[in-house]
């Protein structure tokens, strides 16, 4: 079983993917972990590699390629990343969402910054990513038609979200 978990910053994609991995007993790989591995391969810090990636479209393409290869070579896998659903044949494609204020609050707590700073950073990052995804892959990240299940994570705690997904898996 291949599952993709996507969503914007602060929606709980990593938490959800980790819980699903634990409940289902199948591995979980995040696009972030692939990114960190690529930075290490280049002998760069994550920050240095992030700056390098901003001007090098091939980094995004390589992350997508590696996720697709992992999915093809795995019988059971959970892939977490904003674009995972676009590059992987999956049994279930999830999209998690939450209001901007909620996401900013979560990120402010996680990263020890003010809610206002977190909110501004989210807006800048998401605008930049939306343009990059459109430019590099011709993907409109706001079009959610590709997803099988969308969950507003503001409405449920992580355990409840996991139960919703596990229930969905029983009927597909």
Swiss-Prot record:
Pfam families given in the database record: Cytidylate_kin2
Catalytic activity from the UniProt record: CMP + ATP = CDP + ADP; dCMP + ATP = dCDP + ADP
CDD domains: CMPK
Subcellular location: Cytoplasm
GO cellular component: cytoplasm
Record-listed ATP binding positions: 7-15
Gene3D superfamilies, alphabetized: P-loop containing nucleotide triphosphate hydrolases (3.40.50.300)
Superkingdom per UniProt: Archaea
EC number from the UniProt entry: 2.7.4.25
GO biological process, one term: pyrimidine nucleotide metabolic process
Gene Ontology terms, MF aspect: ATP binding; CMP kinase activity; dCMP kinase activity
Keywords: ATP-binding, Cytoplasm, Kinase, Nucleotide-binding, Transferase
Family, similarity comment: Belongs to the cytidylate kinase family. Type 2 subfamily.
Protein name: Cytidylate kinase
Organism, as annotated: Methanobrevibacter smithii (strain ATCC 35061 / DSM 861 / OCM 144 / PS)
Phylogenetic classification of the source organism: Archaea, Methanobacteriati, Methanobacteriota, Methanomada group, Methanobacteria
